[in-house]
C-alpha cells in the first residue's frame, strides 16, 4: 500500500523564527499561514512544525505544559485549524512535533506529583533515591546530574534527561502510555497528517541502582547513554502506541527522532513487521574529522570539518541496509545543529552540490527553513545570547588557552544550534520582513539573502532548490535503486536506476578540479551547480561543482 509520505518532501519550520504576524517579535501560526503560497511555490508537499503547544519556553517549546492547547505566543486553536485547512488546500501535509519523553515541570501532572506524595501522578514521573542521596552518577544532556531534589522535601529526586525543568515521564506506567497515545490521536483527529516523535529512544531507562563506570569521581556526573537510549523496552512500549495510531489513522506518518540509533536499530524501528515507525531521523550520518581540534581547550564548540570518507560510507550503509525496508530521512541541517552554509559548505556552489548529493538519494528530504535561500547561522556577540551554560564553560576554557573571548564566541556561533534558528529573511524591509519589532532571538545576520530577491532571480539558490525538488518528485529519484560508484576521496558519485532509466549524480568535494570517467551512457544534463565539462565520456568538475546526468 502506497502512502502520501512515500513521496514526501518535508520543509521544517521553526515557528518562532518563520513569520511574526502580530508585532511581538515572535513567529506564529498566522505568520506561517501567510507564507503558504511561498511553500507551494517552492514545491514541497509537507511541513514539520517544531513544538507549538503551551510551554514556559525553557527549551523553546520542547517543555510542554499543556498538550491540548496552542501556546498563546503561537496563536489560537482556531488559527491551527485554519492552518491545517489551508495547508491541505495547497496540497501540503502537516506534521507536528510530539514530545514523548518528558513534560514541563509546570505540567499539571508534575505539579500534582510534587504537591502530594500520594498523588497518582507521582508514578507518571521517575522519583528515586532516599535520604537526599542521588540514586546514581548519570549525567544530563544539558549538564549536571539527571537527578534533581524533589521540591516536596521527601529526600527523593526526580529524573530529567534534559533540563531540570523538564522531568522525564515514567513510560513503565501504562497510564502514561495511554495518556500519550490519546494526545497523539487528539491531534490526528484534528486533521494533522503525521507526528515527529521527539526523543522516543529515551523513554526506557535501565536499572536506576547502577552507576556508569568512570575512571575517577572527577568524571561524574557522566552521560550514561547505554543506560537510557535504545533499550529493548523502547520497542515494547512504542509498539502498542504506533499500532493504535495506525489502526485509527493508517495514513499518518510516524517519524521517529532516533539521534544515536545505528542502521541496525533503524531497521528494527522501521521494519513493517515490527509495527513501529515509518522512518527515523538519525544523527549518525555526520562523522566529523577530529584531527583539527586544539587539545588545549574544550572541543565541543570548536569547528570540525566533515570526514567525507566516513560520510560516504555512512550514507551508503544506510541506503543499502534500509533498501526495501523503509526510506531514510535525508537532511543537512535542522534546529539541533549549525546550518549547512555555515557548518559544511565552503561557498554557494558547494551548498547547491551537496543539496543534490543528499536529496537525490533514496529517501525523504527534510529541508530546514531558509536552507533554500543559503541562510547561515547568526553571529552571537554575547555569551548570554546562547542561553547555554556549556558555551560559557567553552569560552572560559578557550580563554585559559590564550584564545580571545571574541574568537571563542565566533567558534560557538558557527557550531551551536541556537544561531541556526535565526529569523527567516523575507524581503529588504526592517528585520527582513520577519517582524516590525525586535526579533525574539539576538544575533548578527551574516548573509544578504532574502526570499523576495531570490524568487526574482532565475539563477538564485531558491530557484535551484525549486528545480531540485521538482526533479526529486520524478519516479526515478523516488523509487530507483541506489549504487555508489568507486571514485577518489575528492568526489562523491552515485547512480539511481529504475527499469531502463538511469541517472548519475556526481559531486566534487575538492577545492581542485577533478576528472571522472563516466562513459558515454550519461550525456543529458538535468541539473548542475558550478562549472563542469563533459567530453567523450570524461567528466571534469571544477571545485565543489556537481551535476546530474541521465542516459
Predicted regions located by residue number:
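Beta-strand-rich binding/interaction modules
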Residues: 513-529
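C-terminal beta-strand-rich structural cap/linker in extracellular carbohydrate-active enzymes
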Residues: 535-551
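Loop/helix patches that line or flank the sugar-binding groove of alpha-linked glycan CAZymes
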Residues: 5-6, 216-218, 223-226, 236-238, ...
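Basic/polar N-terminal segments that are highly enriched at the extreme N-terminus
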Residues: 1-2, 551
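Acidic/aromatic-lined carbohydrate-recognition and catalytic surfaces
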Residues: 2-185, 189, 202-262, 272, ...
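Hydrophobic residues within beta-strands of alpha/beta enzymes
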Residues: 47, 195-197
Amino acid at each position: 500500500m502506497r502512502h502520501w509520505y512515500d513521496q514526501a518532501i518535508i520543509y521544517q519550520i521553526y515557528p518562532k523564527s518563520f513569520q511574526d504576524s502580530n508585532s511581538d517579535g515572535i513567529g506564529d501560526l498566522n505568520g506561517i499561514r501567510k507564507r503558504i503560497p511561498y511553500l507551494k511555490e517552492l514545491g514541497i508537499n509537507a511541513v514539520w512544525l517544531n513544538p507549538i503547544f503551551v510551554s514556559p519556553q525553557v527549551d523553546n517549546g520542547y517543555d510542554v505544559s499543556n498538550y491540548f492547547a496552542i501556546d498563546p505566543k503561537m496563536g489560537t486553536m482556531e488559527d491551527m485549524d485554519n492552518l491545517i485547512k489551508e495547508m491541505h488546500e495547497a496540497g501540503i501535509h502537516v506534521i507536528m512535533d510530539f514530545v514523548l519523553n518528558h513534560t514541563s515541570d509546570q505540567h499539571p501532572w508534575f505539579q500534582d506529583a510534587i504537591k502530594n506524595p500520594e498523588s497518582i501522578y507521582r508514578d507518571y514521573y521517575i522519583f528515586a533515591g532516599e535520604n537526599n542521596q542521588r540514586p546514581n552518577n548519570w549525567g544530563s544532556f544539558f549538564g549536571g546530574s539527571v537527578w534533581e531534589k524533589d521540591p516536596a522535601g521527601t529526600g527523593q529526586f526526580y529524573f530529567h534527561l534534559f533540563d531540570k525543568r523538564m522531568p522525564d515521564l515514567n513510560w513503565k506506567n501504562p497510564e502514561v502510555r495511554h495518556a500519550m497515545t490519546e494526545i497523539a490521536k487528539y491531534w490526528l483527529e484534528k486533521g494533522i497528517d503525521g507526528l515527529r516523535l521527539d526523543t522516543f529512544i529515551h523513554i526506557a531507562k535501565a536499572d536506576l541502582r547502577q552507576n556508569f563506570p568512570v575512571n575517577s569521581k572527577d568524571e561524574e556526573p557522566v552521560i550514561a547513554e547505554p543506560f537510557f537510549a535504545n533499550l529493548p523496552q523502547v520497542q515494547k512500549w512504542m509498539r502498542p502506541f504506533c499500532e493504535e495510531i495506525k489502526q485509527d489513522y493508517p495514513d499518518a506518518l510516524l517519524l521517529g527522532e532516533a539521534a544515536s540509533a545505528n542502521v541496525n536499530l533503524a531497521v528494527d524501528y522501521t521494519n513493517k513487521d515490527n509495527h513501529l515507525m515509518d522512518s527515523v531521523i538519525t544523527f549518525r550520518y555526520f562523522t566529523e574529522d577530529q584531527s583539527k581540534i586544539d587539545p588545549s581547550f574544550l572541543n565541543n564548540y570548536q569547528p570540525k570539518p566533515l570526514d567525507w570518507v566516513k560520510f560516504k560510507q555512512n550514507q551508503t550503509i544506510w541506503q543499502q541496509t534500509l533498501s526495501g525496508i523503509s526510506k531514510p530521512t535525508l537532511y543537512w541541517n535542522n534546529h539541533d545543529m549549525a546550518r549547512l552554509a555555515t557548518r559544511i559548505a565552503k561557498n554557494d556552489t558547494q551548498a547547491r552540490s551537496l543539496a543534490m548529493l543528499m536529496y537525490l538519494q533514496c529517501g525523504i528530504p527534510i529541508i530546514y527553513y531558509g536552507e533554500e535561500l543559503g541562510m547561515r547561522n547568526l553571529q552571537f556577540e554575547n555569551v548570554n545570547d546562547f542561553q547555554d551554560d556549556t558555551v560559557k564553560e567553552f569560552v572560559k576554557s578557550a580563554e585559559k588557552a590564550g584564545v580571545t573571548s571574541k574568537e571563542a564566541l565566533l567558534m560557538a556561533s558557527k557550531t551551536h544550534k541556537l544561531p541556526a534558528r535565526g529569523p527567516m529573511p523575507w524581503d529588504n524591509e526592517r528585520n527582513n520582513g520577519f517582524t516590525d519589532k525586535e526579533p525574539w532571538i539576538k544575533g548578527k545576520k551574516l548573509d544578504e539573502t532574502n526570499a523576495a530577491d531570490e524568487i526574482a532571480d532565475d539563477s538564485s539558490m531558491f530557484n535551484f532548490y525549486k528545480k531540485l525538488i521538482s526533479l526529486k518528485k520524478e519516479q526515478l529519484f523516488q523509487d530507483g535503486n541506489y549504487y555508489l560508484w568507486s571514485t577518489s576521496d575528492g568526489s562523491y558519485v552515485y547512480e539511481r536506476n529504475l527499469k531502463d532509466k538511469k541517472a548519475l549524480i556526481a559531486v566534487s568535494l575538492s577545492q581542485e578540479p577533478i576528472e571522472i570517467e563516466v562513459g558515454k551512457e550519461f550525456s543529458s544534463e538535468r541539473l548542475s551547480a558550478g562549472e563542469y565539462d563533459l567530453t567523450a565520456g570524461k567528466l571534469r568538475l571544477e571545485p565543489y561543482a556537481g551535476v546530474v546526468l541521465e542516459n
